[in-house]
Amino acid sequence: MASLRLPRANPLAFTRWPVTVITAIVYLALLIPLLVVHHVVPSAPSSPPSGLNISEAWADLQVLTNGFHPYNSRRNDVIHSWLLRRINEILDSTPLEQEYRALDEEKPDVFVFDDVYSNLTTYGGTLKDADLGVYFEGTNVIVYIRGWEDDTEHWWEAPNGVPTSRGGVLVNSHYDSVSTGFGATDDGVGVVTCLQLVKYFTTPGHAPRRGLVVLFNNGEEDFLNGARVYSQHPISKLPHTFLNLEGAGAGGRATLFRSSDFEVTGPYMRSPHPFGSVLSANGFDTGLIASQTDYVIFQGNMGLRGLDVAFMEPRARYHTNQDDTRHTSKDSVWHMLSAAVATTEGLVSDSTDRFDGAPNTDGGVPSGSGSQAVWFDLFGSTFVLFQLHTLFALLVTLLIVGPLTLLFTSIALTKADKMYLFRSSAKSEDRLDVVPLQGLRGFFRFPFLFGIPTVVTVGLAYLVTKVNPYIIHSSAYAVWSMMVAAWVFLAWFVSRVADFARPSAFHRIYTLTWMYVLSWVSAVIATVYANQRGLAGGYFIFFFHAGIFLATWISYLELFALPSKTEYANQLRSVSGRASGHGSRRGTTSGEDDGEEAEEEPTESTSLLGSGQRTTFANYVRVGGDNHAVAEEEVIDPNVYGREQAWSYALPKWTWGLQLLLTAPITLIMVGPLALLTISAISQTGQDGGHPLFAYVAIAIFTTIMLTPLLPFIHRYTYHVPLFLLAVFLGTLIYNLVAFPFSDSNRLKLYYVQEVDLDTGVNSATFAGLSPFVKDVSQELPSAAGQTVSCEWHTKRRNLLSCSWEGIAPQPVEGDHPMKDWGALKGNVVCLWSDHNQPGVLPALDEAIQFLPVWAAVTKGSDGLVEGRRAFEIGNDD
């Protein structure tokens, strides 16, 4: 058997080793930085800007988090007093007036409001429970730094007073924690950031143009009460824009969760390390993210325009005792602080009227309205921001221009007689000879090439969900590795089988054409959602579609390098004539399509010119003579790869690299961060009752999108990488099916509450969590020994099992028996206890924390850790 030896001088040729090495380098060169950006927080500077002190902020965070401080606790009152003292210390340390005047500015007036008077009653539709009503008395701390364009009067002291200056800026954080968490990230970092903002904007050189209101609200963890009651304070009429600082994880980077519009998002571009995507905002808009922050009060109820910046992972530490300073860092503090300073400085220095206008909610502030925005970061260092209607215009343009460009190119190819696509044969100039082109070969590969790996990865999602549904909680990258390895190996295997059975030089162009059609349909869907529902999360589809269009167009332009079909037919007839030696025509064939239809099984001597001539593996042309006399002439062209069509010698050998660079990098850069952000956000939501299948299917979808750019080139891969990935797949599959899903660094949260019926004396401690783990943990507690642990499905937390046993009686406090006369009334009085700072007060909870396995954590299951309940009935006085 003769072997084909292609020239090795060109390291960019479309051959196996260049394709394997270059594609691997491109993917690794992008995936590694994306992973680093996602997991590594930029270092805090050794010398921060004037007016900021990171060491001071870290010391404040340590004080703030040295105990649980929910709204309903003594520790919360201690933090309230400490905040007032720290604010006064910062203000007392400001320099004299002369230092401000040296910088051509006035020292700003600062007003501190210890708001223990505002109160609010909310009920019905404003809360999650339509049957619930809440009366709340606030203990917010408000700092107002007067802008040098603000009114100089104390307008807030006048009855119904309103500011006459342009709207100010609100920066919000909450200083209460949950009863089971120290609140370092939720929301201690936000609180110390606000303290540093007070310091920064009272430092010479940073006096604000617009008034700045810094709010330390108390009561966010219970119905967002702190933000609600802030709306009752007169100073709430001043701000038109806001920045909300929040935490839903422990450490890491602070991401831009959402923003109200294009104009208010602009100042965030000043952040030295921007991070986030508008896709997360769409998650809130569509209801996929059910939890809320104070953002919804400021933007939805009060009509302000602003941004929501928050920490978002890992969720396993959220609202637990691992939300402490040990599990965050100064770098995380700096990441939020630097973003807050940049954004706030941009908002308070704005000199336009774009944040003033008609209220956009009933009774809201006159903040006007803005344009819908598209925004995302690039490698955590650059922030891209443009308006949604710009995305719509770009999508519509590309949807029209792309098909027309390919159509006109196809027409030009047809006129030049170089349209080999979909052509099974060609005729010579005298139209007497018909030679096969095999131009349809490879067209029907893509549905199998794309479909089989995708279906298998989705099937793996269902398999893991069935066998070990929560392994993603602690081993998300094992799931990623399994999906990626399976997808690449199957795509390579299918492509190699197809290439062996039907070798085709058109594999690349047909695959890109199919990809273009799919991306075009996706772009249509993204356009419809952007126009009708204002959802901008499909922005990545535009870039994905644009790259595929250009790569596809390049493949069509490559066809101009081919000889015309007539010229090619003449060349083959000339070769056939010389080989026969007697001028007879050889190898004439019908014009029937031989692309994907049944034909002679290809072997080393499969016919090149149909039934008359045969070619060896090395592209020999063998011409048979009459009466078994054989005359043979060898025609070898090293520019033809393998057993592909002979006319492919003229195709460029380097353009594949350009096509790879147009498809793979842009896909990874656009989709990679979304994949990491999305899976980080949802991989641990199963413990909250979310269905785990969603996370696995999401990984399968992201895997398919990010690896699809490999399909036009994967048939050129050597076997080394796919076989290695096959081994990775088998190993990770076994691990994902049998490994225990939780660990001490990725614990399972169990929701705890203790209920005491003061009439009957029934004392019930309850854990709610995933089955069967919650039952196993409950039965192992000493107080549950010898008892029958009662388990039933939770009525409010879907997919969670609630297990109860007779707990150790709480010893919160001794009290008296106040009496009051009412009219006819009956119901239940419920008292809550949330303070768990003193051992022995809640012995059942102390026991649970002490004896829980290392892979489980306690979090609050209700507003109180203990709920004391007593029925009452008061008759009529008469």
UniProtKB/Swiss-Prot annotation:
Stretches that traverse the bilayer: 17-37, 391-411, 443-463, 474-494, 509-529, 534-554, 660-680, 694-714, 722-742
Binding site for Zn(2+) 1: H174, D186, E246
Biased composition annotated in UniProt, kind: Low complexity: 577-590
Residue ranges that the UniProt entry lists as topological domain Vacuolar: 38-390, 464-473, 530-533, 681-693, 743-878
Domain of life, per lineage: Eukaryota
Active site: E220 (proton acceptor)
EC number annotated for this UniProt entry: 3.4.-.-
Enzyme class: hydrolase
Subcellular location: Vacuole membrane
Biased composition (Acidic residues): 591-603
Site feature Transition state stabilizer, where: Y318
Cofactor remark from the record: Binds 2 Zn(2+) ions per subunit.
Parts of the chain on the Cytoplasmic side: 1-16, 412-442, 495-508, 555-659, 715-721
Function, in words: May be involved in vacuolar sorting and osmoregulation.
Protein name (database record): Vacuolar membrane protease
